[in-house]
């Protein structure tokens, strides 16, 4: 079972992992994967301590060399902080975290976006050039500050493993 908690990029949850995992674990004994704001090996270990079996990272992997994301998206992630992440239901009718800079680059004003009343996962917006979420409007999790460079996925995985082992060794 994948739990998307508060802080996740894209369509996000509203409950923190600290509350979500124990609540689900109280009635579900199968595998749990926790996502949302996990950016390093210590966060993966924290997910396990909470009762999850795995931690899920998304935003960090978008900025890897192997990612199919446009270079401009990856560069935007490297430059971003949590202050650049905006929660809005404007594009799909479902709240999601997006990079404000991508909204601005698409010719929209983040301060004037209104939530859709309907739900549509086409992600279209009737603004300049009919921008589309996932193509023109890019998501990121609140832990985006941890994306400090574009690197090979293998390098990121090795870093996460080392951080995880360090966190696991702590009493």
Q: What do these predicted regions represent?
A:
Residues 8-13, 63:
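Short, small-residue-enriched loops and turns at beta-alpha junctions
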């Amino acid at each position: 079972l994948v739990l998307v908690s508060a802080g996740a990029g894209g369509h996000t949850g509203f409950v923190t992992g600290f509350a979500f995992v124990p609540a689900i674990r109280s009635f579900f004994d199968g595998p749990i994967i926790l996502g949302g704001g996990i950016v390093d090996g210590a966060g993966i270990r924290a997910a396990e301590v909470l009762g999850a079996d795995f931690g899920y990272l998304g935003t960090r992997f978008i900025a890897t060399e192997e990612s199919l994301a446009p270079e401009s998206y990856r560069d935007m992630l490297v430059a971003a902080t949590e202050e650049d992440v905006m929660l809005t239901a404007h594009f799909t009718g479902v709240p999601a975290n997006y990079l404000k800079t991508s909204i601005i680059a698409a010719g929209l004003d983040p301060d004037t976006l209104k939530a859709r009343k309907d739900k549509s996962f086409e992600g279209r917006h009737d603004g300049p050039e009919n921008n589309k979420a996932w193509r023109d409007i890019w998501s990121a999790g609140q832990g985006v500050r941890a994306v400090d460079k574009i690197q090979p996925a293998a390098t990121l995985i090795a870093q996460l493993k080392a951080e995880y082992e360090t966190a696991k060794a702590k009493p």
